[in-house]
Structure formats: C-alpha cells, structure tokens
Curated annotation (Swiss-Prot):
This is Photosystem I P700 chlorophyll a apoprotein A2. Its EC number is 1.97.1.12. It comes from Thermosynechococcus vestitus (strain NIES-2133 / IAM M-273 / BP-1). One of its GO terms (cellular component) is plasma membrane-derived thylakoid membrane. The keyword Transport applies. Belongs to the PsaA/PsaB family.
C-alpha cells in the first residue's frame, strides 16, 4: 500500500479527514515531534539542512549575477553610474501590447526590462568588478559552490559521515572555529580582496587572474609590515578630488582612518573599510583562541557560567548574576539557542538598515534614492520577523526544554520569579507612550482642522539634538564635545592628530547626506509613536514567553504545548492565552511598528532628496498631514499607473499596489471568523459539489473538516503580512522612482 503524506507521522497519515494535510504542513519542520526521532538524529538532520540552505543562497546570488551579465547593462552603467539606470533582467511577457512594450523598453535597452533596485550594481562595482565577464565568472564560481554545498549536505546524511551528538555539543570547539574561522578568516580574506583587487580598481589599475600575483597593492610591499612601520600603509591617501575608477587624484594608501565620505561617490572610503575588516579579523582570530578544547588551555564556558569568584572577590556569577546551570540549559536546548541567534541576527539586520543609508559603503549608491529606500525597508521588515521569531522559540524553549530544578536560583529562574514586575512595567510604559503620543497628535490634528495651527503643541527633541551636537553637529549651537573644537573630545588623543575627525565633521555637517539628519517636533512625535509600537510588541512577546509555562489563570499551561486554542468550557477564559496567540498578536504590532518606521524614514528622505525639508517638518506634527501629504500625495502615481490613455513603466507597481490591498483584505476574512463558520462553509461547499454535474465525478477520500481556530488565524496572518508588505513595497518603489527615476 502506498504510504500517505506525511511519512514522518504514522498517526497523522492515518487521519481520515483533511486535518491530515493541515497538521502535516504545521508539523513538517517540527523535527522533534517526528516518529522515531532521536536527539542525535535531530541534530544531524538540522546540520545537513544548513548545507541545503547555503546552496540556495549561492544559487540565488549566482542567478542575479548571471541575469545581469546576460540581460543587464552593467558595462554601460560602469561608464556613468549616476545617470544610468541599472537593469535587473529582461521581461518576456506575451500579454504585453505595444503600449506596454514601449513603456518597459527603458534604461537604454532595446526590449522590455526591469530596473534593479537592489543595489547589486553598486556592490559589484565597489568591490572591483567592471565587465560582464567578471559577472559570469562569479556566477559560475557560485554554481560550483552551490553544488559542493549540496554534495556536503547529502554526504553528512550518510551513516559514515554523520557527526556524533558529542561533536554537536562541543561548544568550545565550535565557538573557536566560528569566531576564528568563520568571522576572523573571512574578514581577513575580505580585507585582502579589498586591498588587492577593489582599491587598485578604484584607482584605475585592473587586477585580474592574469596579473594579481605580479601587481603589488602598495609600492612599499611587505617591508613596513615586517619592520613594524605600519603607518606607511596609511600615508598618501586618495585626495578629495579623486575620480573613482581612475588614477586622477588617487593616492597609494591601503589602510586609512580618514572618516567621512569620498566626495564624488558619497560612500565610505574603501581604504577605511579595508582597515575596518583587517581590525575585525585580528580581533576575531584572537577571540577564536580563547576557549578550552583538547589542549587544556583557555576558558571553559561551563566553569565561567558556574564561577562564584571574580579575581578573589565573591560574586553571584558572571556580571554578578547567578548563571549556574545555564551552560547545560543552553547547550541542550536547540530552541534556546535559536531564540538567542534570531534575536542577535534581528538586531544586526536592523543595524544594517540604519547604517546602509547613514554610512553608505557602496560607490554612488547614496545617489540612487529608490534603491536606498528599498534596502532600508527590506532590512527593517526582515529584522521585525527575526525578532518575533526569537520570542516564539524562547516560548517553545520554556514549554519544552526548561528544567526548573536545573536552573534553580539562576538568572532564568529570577526572570520567571519576577515576571509580573517585568510585564507590568512594560504595560505602563506602553500605556504612557500610547496616550501621550496619541493625545499630542490628536490635539494638533484638531487645532489644524479648526484653522489655528499656531495652537499646536510642538516639542523640540532637545536631548536628541544634544546627542547629535555631542557627535559634532553644529546647527543647533550647543557648542559641546565634538561640536566644540576646544573640548576634551576634540583635543584628546588621537583626534588632535587630525586622524578621522576632519572627515567626520565634514560629513556630519553636510546637507547632502543622511548622517544625523536635522530633527524637530515632527521627529519627536514619530519617535514616540515608534517607541509605543516597539514597547507594545515587546510587552506582548515577553508576556507570551514568560507565561508560556503557566499563568495565574492557567498554571498548567506547559502541559498543553505552544499552540493550544482553549482548554474547553470547564475552565472558562482559557482562550487566546497560549504562547502562539501572543506571537500572533505581536506579529500585527510588529508590522504596524515597522510601517511607522518606514513611513517616517521615507517621508523624511523624500524631503532631503528633493531639497524640500519644510513639507515633512510642517505636516508631520498632525495625523492628517501624514495621511494627506505622505500617503495620499505619494500614491497618486500608483493610482494613475494605467488609465484609459495607455500605460507607463509604473503600471506594474500600480497593479501590485491593488493586488497587495486585495491579499491584505483577504486576511480579514480568515481573522474575523471562528471554527463554526468554517465548518458550515465547508459543509455547504461539499453539499454543492456533490450535487453539481461533472464536478461530482471528482471524489476525495479525506472527510472535509474545518480549519481550527489556530489554522484559520495562520492563514489570515499570512495574507495580512504578505498583502501589507506587497502594498507598501509597490508604494515605496513607485513613489520614489516616479520622482527620481
């Protein structure tokens, strides 16, 4: 007999209803719950899947390289990066009529093409690529890497090549290898690439496979390195008049600390970035030799966690907090590890979003406004999903893996002991922020509507302005720290040697970049609106995780798992209190918050780019300003993307804008209905199907049953999220591209 899906659960495979399919999809990645799963097998499966993941990433980047080389205009773009629009790939669409073909034949192409808003052209250009041949070579190299990764994944599932459980739990060795090997050596390799290939290319000297062994990256060679005279590598940097990609105004330095931006490209100095990666490499290679393995030297993480002595002083543990039992808890719980990793990666991803625009690393990318907007929004949304995932797996850890006896008296136990204080503090912060921020916005909205805008309550963000002034911004006249040339911040070593300060001060006081933008009352308000969103999302997630094992209402919650809908009518009031429900609610708040973040960023930057900062400053202090002067005003291009007079190259975004709204609205159908609705709907559909000629020739074996409450919410949440992001992506790209190309 053919085995039914899913193979991993005999119990589910024998379910006679359509629940079999739904539950199987829900449990497919929950390896722990699969039939016959052992702890060792679990680790091996996850380990092998990492190679598949890497293969997908390599294939994806390879595809980008290949399509740009084949159908893009990289070589033309390199000749004039500021005025040429980069092409992502060609469009072949049999539905295009003449109007559409004409509209999408753009950027100097002879056939319909898509414009690239990912920044890959700027990245490849900055790192030294100049020809389509370079791109093809990269694509083929990554294809080979992808095949190797797939082979490695397959190999590590073969009995002889499956690592043992003890290998996976050897935390010290893994840390050493990841710190020194993964971070350290790869940073060193990147510094090497920048010094040997990218910096010479930026100075008009081509380095390829034919001459890289004979071309010295620095005229002094390695002599200064071996004699300790390292300062030689910083002498004679590129001048302010350097034309990127040519020898005009170029220097010879390879490792510098100039600060600020290259005047022509408006991006960080390549020599500063090479220096940065070299420094990171040194730090991480040292860090990768800190932990004790078979040589018996270095730190034991377990001993550090359990230590109660700090250089002879009695302490409770690391940071004077009790950590006994944490090593075992962390090392034996994949959910605990995943929670930490997602949280760290989420923070890093959000930092990438902030730094991509304020300190742009790629040549000329700051002048491609649509790309900057797309990259900021992309990274902030990803950060949001990662952060919510961190708390979800934290909650699963507490339900499945947390051992109260093993953690008695340590920091985890302490957090659970005083969870009421944590939750109530987050609650009052959220309430305070919500009422006060909304109160100010509503007050301002009303007085503007009544024609007395002078009655608005406008608060200058003086503390934030002080922080900007401390970093060197002169505009506010605070005359403090780096904005005062006589202060200790400006005169202390090494600044008095004019190492990085002049470049930094030029950059922070320039009106043409996004470094420390000038802020006022509108920024003050939206900052607090975002703070409200962040604190409320955190409140929901923290409560969901800390109450995942049990709460006053339902002390035995842990016995019901992560995603129970309710515990029956016998204990009324136990609906909507599982950790899954907290995750579900937090997703909406997360999306809401990132909406505010991206609205703010985009509107503020539209003003900076257009040279009209007054519109944001005047309209952002009341609600109608946001609705009318940001959303409505900037969606006009989308609403007009195609009309009775034909089409333009924004029509695809206009269509996506409509379609995104449709997907988003579909979400509500699943969110605002409970199980009985679905059961009746399905029985009605089945009844109609069985009485419809021809249709009733098609039968199925599974008895149709309704979506559970949790399943319907998942479908609703998926539609809501996808529609929400799709709608804003279309709005963001079209409104920016309509203004700046």
């Amino acid at each position: 007999m053919a085995t039914k899906f899913p193979k991993f659960s005999q119990d589910l495979a024998q379910d006679p209803t359509t629940r079999r399919i739904w539950y199987a999809i829900a449990m497919a990645h929950d390896f722990e719950s699969h039939d016959g799963m052992t702890e060792e097998n679990l680790y091996q499966k996850i380990f092998a899947s990492h190679f598949g993941h890497l293969a997908i990433i390599f294939l994806w980047v390879s595809g980008s390289l290949f399509h740009v080389a084949w159908q893009g205009n990289f070589e033309q773009w390199v000749q004039d990066p500021v005025n040429t629009r980069p092409i992502a790939h060609a469009i072949w669409d049999p539905q295009f009529g003449k109007a559409a073909v004409d509209a999408f034949t753009q950027a100097g192409a002879s056939n319909p093409v898509d414009i690239a808003y990912s920044g890959v052209y700027h990245w490849w250009y900055t790192i030294g690529m100049r020809t389509n041949g370079d791109l093809y070579q990269g694509a083929i190299f990554l294809l080979i890497l992808a095949s190797l990764a797939l082979f490695a994944g397959w190999l590590h599932l073969q009995p002889k090549f499956r690592p043992s459980l003890s290998w996976f739990k050897n935390a010290e060795s893994r840390l050493n290898h990841h710190l020194a090997g993964l971070f350290g050596v790869s940073s060193l390799a990147w510094a090497g690439h920048l010094i040997h290939v990218a910096i010479p290319e930026s100075r008009g000297q081509h380095v390829g496979w034919d001459n890289f062994l004979s071309t010295m990256p620095h005229p002094a060679g390695l002599a200064p390195f071996f004699t300790g005279n390292w300062g030689v590598y910083a002498q004679n940097p590129d001048t302010a008049s350097h034309v990127f990609g040519t020898a005009q105004g170029a220097g010879t330095a390879i490792l510098t600390f100039l600060g600020g931006f290259h005047p022509q490209t408006e991006s960080l100095w390549l020599t500063d970035m090479a220096h940065h990666h070299l420094a990171i490499a040194v730090l991480f290679i040292v860090a990768g030799h800190m932990y004790r393995t078979q040589f018996g030297i270095g730190h034991s993480i377990k001993e550090m966690m359990d230590a109660k002595d700090f250089f002879g002083t009695k302490v409770e543990g690391p940071f004077n907090m009790p950590h006994q039992g944490i090593y075992e808890t962390y090392n034996n719980s994949l959910h605990f590890q995943l929670g930490w990793h997602l949280a760290c990666l989420g923070v890093i991803t959000s930092l990438v979003a902030q730094h991509m625009y304020s300190l742009p690393p790629y040549a000329f990318i700051a002048q491609d406004h649509t790309t900057m907007a797309a990259l900021y929004t992309h990274h902030q949304y990803i950060a949001g999903f990662l952060m919510v995932g961190a708390f979800a797996h934290g909650a699963i850890f507490l339900v499945r893996d947390y051992d109260p006896a093993q953690n008695k008296g340590n920091v985890l136990d302490r957090v659970l002991q005083h969870k009421e204080a944590i939750i109530s503090h987050l609650s009052w912060v959220s309430l305070f922020l919500g009422f006060h921020t909304l109160g100010l916005y509503v007050h301002n909205d009303v007085v503007v509507a009544f024609g007395t805008p002078e009655k608005q309550i406008l608060i200058e963000p003086v503390f934030a302005q002080f922080i900007q002034a401390a970093h060197g911004k002169l505009l506010y006249g605070f005359d403090t720290l780096l904005s005062n040339p006589d202060s200790i911040a400006s005169t202390a070593w090494p600044n008095y040697g004019n190492v990085w300060l002049p470049g930094w001060l030029d950059a922070i006081n320039s009106g043409t970049n996004s470094l420390f933008l000038t802020i006022g009352p509108g920024d003050f308000l939206v900052h607090h609106a975002i703070a409200l969103g962040l604190h409320t999302t955190t409140l929901i997630l923290v409560k969901g995780a800390l109450d995942a094992r049990g709460s006053k209402l339902m002390p035995d919650k842990k016995d019901f798992g992560y995603a129970f809908p309710c515990d029956g009518p016998g204990r009324g009031g136990t609906c909507d209190i599982s950790a899954w429900d907290a995750f579900y609610l937090a997703m909406f708040w997360m999306l809401n918050t990132i909406g505010w973040v991206t609205f703010y960023w985009h509107w503020k930057h539209l003003g900076v780019w257009e040279g009209n900062v007054a519109q944001f400053n005047e309209s952002s202090t009341y609600l109608m300003g946001w609705l009318r002067d940001y959303l409505w005003l900037n969606s006009s291009q989308l609403i007009n993307g195609y009309n009775p007079f034909g089409t333009n190259n924004l029509s695809v975004w206009a269509w996506m804008f409509l379609f995104g709204h449709l997907v988003w609205a579909t979400g509500f159908m699943f969110l605002i209905s409970w199980r009985g609705y679905w059961q009746e709907l399905i029985e009605t559909l089945v009844w109609a199907h069985e009485r419809t000629p021809l249709a009733n020739l098609v039968r199925w074996k599974d008895k149709p049953v309704a979506l559970s409450i949790v399943q319907a919410r998942l479908v609703g949440l998926a539609h809501f999220s996808v529609g929400y992001i799709l709608t804003y992506a279309a709005f963001l790209i079209a409104s920016t591209a309509a203004k700046f190309g």
